[in-house]
A protein has these predicted regions:
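Bacterial N-terminal signal peptides that target proteins for export
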Residues: 1-13
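Sec/Tat signal peptide C-region and signal peptidase I cleavage site
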Residues: 25-29
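Structural cue for short, hydrophobic secondary-structure segments
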Residues: 60-63, 86
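The serine-hydrolase catalytic nucleophile loop
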Residues: 64-74
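Recognition helices and adjacent regulatory flanks at domain boundaries
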Residues: 70, 89-92
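A short, Lys/Arg-enriched amphipathic alpha-helix followed by its capping loop at the start of a domain
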Residues: 73-82, 120
Length: 317
C-alpha cells in the first residue's frame, strides 16, 4: 500500500511539474520578442514587438547610428508587464531605405513615419523611451498628441541648449556652412572606429560591451547612399533646436510623468543636458548612471528596474 501511495504521489508530482512547465512555456511564448514589418506611406518598416497585446505600450525610439537592436535586452526584461514596440526608422536597421531622391530624410519626416507606424498598429496611448535621435522624433509626436502620452523615459535624449556641447561644434559648423568640406569630418562618427568609440567611450568596463553592436550598425551603414543619408540627418538636426522652447512648454503645460536615466559620461549628449528637465517637470525621477552614450549596454538591468518601478508608481498599467 505504501508503495502504491508513493507511486501515486510521484505521478502527481510529475504532473504538477509538467503543468508548471507548460504554463511557463506559454508565458514565455506570449512574451517572446517578435520580428515584424508594416508598411507606412509605402515604406516597409521593420519593428520588434514583445508583451501582451492589451498591456500598456512603451514606444522605444532608437538613436544614431543604431536600430531597434539596442532594445533587445530591455524588451525581454519588461515584456511580462508591458507591450514594447521598437521600430527602425527608414534607412536604419532592417527598415527599407528609399533613395534620397524619393524620400525626405529629415526629423520632421521621421516623426511622420513613426506617427503613421502608431496608426497602423492602432496604438492610442503610450509611454515613450527617447534616446538620442529618438528624442526629437518622439517630442514632435508628444507635442502633437499630449493627451496620448502616459509618461516619458528619457535616456540621453536632448531638449535643451545646455546639452549641445563640444561634440556638436563641427556639426554646428556644417549647419552654418552646408558644404561637402564641412560634412566630410562628420563621416568619422559612423566609421568603424567612430562606431566603436560611441559604444565604449565613458563606459566603466568596456569588456562588457559586445563588438556585435558596432559590427551590426556598420553592416547597415555601408549600404549604398547611407553615408549621405546620415549627413542629411546631421544637417536636419538643426531644425530641432528651434523647437526646444515648444517642447519645454509641453513639459510645463502637460507635466507628463518623466523618468531620466542618463549615462553621465556621454560625450555626445552630456549630463548638462539632463539637469534642465528638472526646471520644467514636477513629477520627474532623476538618475545619472556611471556609463556612456549607449547606457543600456552596461546598465540595462538597472534601467529596466527603474522603468518598471517608475511606471508602477505612476500607475501606468
Amino acid at each position: 500500500m505504501l508503495k502504491n501511495l508513493r507511486l501515486r504521489n510521484a505521478v502527481l508530482t510529475l504532473a504538477a511539474i509538467a503543468g508548471l512547465l507548460f504554463t511557463t512555456n506559454d508565458v514565455t511564448a506570449q512574451n517572446a520578442t517578435l520580428y515584424k514589418t508594416v508598411e507606412v506611406d509605402g515604406i516597409e518598416i521593420f519593428y520588434r514587438e514583445a508583451g501582451a497585446a492589451d498591456a500598456p505600450v512603451i514606444l522605444l525610439l532608437h538613436g544614431y547610428p543604431t536600430s531597434s537592436h539596442m532594445f533587445r535586452n530591455l524588451m525581454e526584461d519588461l515584456s511580462d508587464d508591458y507591450r514594447l514596440l521598437a521600430p527602425d526608422y527608414p534607412g536604419f536597421g532592417r527598415s527599407e531605405q528609399p533613395p534620397m531622391a524619393e524620400f525626405d530624410y529629415s526629423f520632421d519626416n521621421m516623426a511622420h513615419i513613426v506617427d503613421g507606424f502608431l496608426d497602423e498598429l492602432e496604438v492610442e496611448t503610450f509611454s515613450i523611451y527617447l534616446m538620442d535621435y529618438g528624442a526629437p522624433i518622439g517630442y514632435r509626436i508628444a507635442a502633437k498628441y499630449p493627451e496620448r502620452i502616459e509618461s516619458l523615459i528619457v535616456q540621453n535624449g536632448n531638449a535643451y541648449d545646455e546639452g549641445l556641447r563640444d561634440f556638436w561644434v563641427p556639426i554646428k559648423k556644417y549647419w552654418n556652412e552646408y558644404t561637402l568640406e564641412n560634412g566630410k569630418p562628420l563621416e568619422g562618427f559612423h566609421s568603424p572606429a567612430g562606431l566603436k568609440w560611441q559604444y565604449t567611450h565613458g563606459v566603466k568596463d568596456t569588456l562588457k560591451i559586445s563588438p556585435d553592436n558596432w559590427n551590426l550598425d556598420l553592416q547597415h551603414l555601408t549600404r549604398p547612399e547611407n553615408n549621405e543619408i546620415q549627413l542629411a540627418l546631421f544637417y536636419s538636426y538643426r531644425t530641432n533646436v528651434p523647437l526646444y522652447p515648444e517642447w519645454q512648454e509641453y513639459f510645463r503645460t502637460y507635466q507628463p510623468p518623466t523618468l531620466i536615466v542618463w549615462g553621465k559620461n556621454d560625450y555626445i549628449f552630456p549630463a548638462e543636458g539632463a539637469h534642465p528637465y528638472k526646471r520644467d517637470l514636477k513629477n520627474v525621477e532623476f538618475h545619472l548612471l556611471n556609463t556612456g552614450h549607449f547606457a543600456l549596454e552596461e546598465k540595462g538591468d538597472e534601467i529596466a528596474a527603474y522603468i518598471d518601478n517608475f511606471l508602477k508608481k505612476n500607475k501606468v498599467q
